[in-house]
């Protein structure tokens, strides 16, 4: 995650996800390469609801952000996942699977949560679910997850499992130079009448960040117009739903076929 430009991660301790965050805490400042310093802030929150809320809030400031959890914690994140979806906020949720349901077998391996990740949250909104098969895939897939979150302005759920989380393996040396960073339509300046949710042919609007001059925007959990103001107008509702769903076409085009 540090190599991929992640600058904020929140978590609430849960097996088997905690190992990742604890490792990141130990290496919050790590020289990745000559032009890329790690410097990632890790925050342990009071619960999983706070964890995803802080990750989404960090993303609003323009930094790459993530949170990490397992099945029971992801259940608690579902509502804020939808909030990120309707507000088109990029965030990466790393879901380390274990055996369920409920507490299940908290220290045992499981791969039960694919459909849950695909369908979590009420209503319809686009998201990307990436499932990695081994440690090496996990490294490079993480870069894809952050890029796709930024490019399409959607939540990305990266599915791993206890085996990947807890294993010590011998593999090829990771190559940070193969990790590219694409921030998508993140603005560095905004002029005139800025519309955070402006209609566009690909469904992806220019994205401001908190504190950007002339880039004021509004976020609520309600349907909104192009500026972000609450709207219950049925025509606007259809337009906004269509706008968000347009991203699916773009995702299917850009995500490599071998990954689908």
Tell me what each language-model feature is.
Residues 1-120, 125-126, 131-132:
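Thiamine diphosphate
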Residues 2-4, 141, 146-260:
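Flexible, low-complexity linker and terminal segments
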Residues 18-19, 101-102, 137, 165-168:
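Short, well-ordered, mixed-charge alpha-helical segments that flank or form enzyme active sites
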Residues 56-59, 63-66, 139-151:
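Active-site-proximal alpha-helical scaffold in enzymes
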Residues 125-147:
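Active-site/ligand-binding-proximal alpha/beta "capping" segment
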């Amino acid at each position: 995650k540090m190599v991929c430009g992640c600058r904020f991660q929140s978590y609430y301790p849960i097996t088997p996800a905690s190992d990742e965050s604890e490792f990141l805490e130990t290496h919050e400042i790590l020289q990745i390469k000559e032009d890329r310093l790690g410097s990632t802030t890790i925050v342990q929150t009071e619960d999983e609801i706070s964890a995803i809320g802080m990750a989404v809030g960090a993303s609003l400031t323009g930094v790459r952000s993530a949170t990490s959890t397992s099945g029971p914690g992801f259940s608690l994140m579902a509502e804020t996942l939808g909030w990120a979806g309707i507000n088109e906020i990029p965030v990466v949720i790393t879901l380390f699977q274990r055996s369920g349901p409920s507490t299940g077998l908290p220290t045992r391996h499981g791969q039960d949560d694919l459909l849950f990740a695909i369908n979590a949250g009420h209503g319809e909104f686009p998201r990307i679910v990436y499932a990695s098969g081994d440690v090496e895939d996990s490294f490079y897939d993480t870069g894809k997850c952050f890029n796709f979150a930024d490019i399409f302005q959607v939540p990305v759920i990266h599915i791993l499992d206890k085996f990947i989380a807890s294993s010590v393996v011998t593999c090829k040396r990771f190559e940070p130079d193969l990790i590219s960073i694409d921030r998508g339509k993140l603005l560095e300046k905004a002029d005139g009448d800025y519309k955070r949710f402006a209609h566009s042919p690909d469904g992806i609007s220019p994205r401001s960040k908190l504190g950007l001059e002339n880039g004021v925007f509004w976020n609520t959990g309600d349907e909104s117009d192009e500026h972000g103001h609450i709207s219950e107008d049925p025509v606007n509702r259809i337009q906004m739903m269509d706008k968000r769903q347009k991203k699916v076409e773009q995702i299917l085009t850009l995500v490599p076929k071998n990954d689908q």
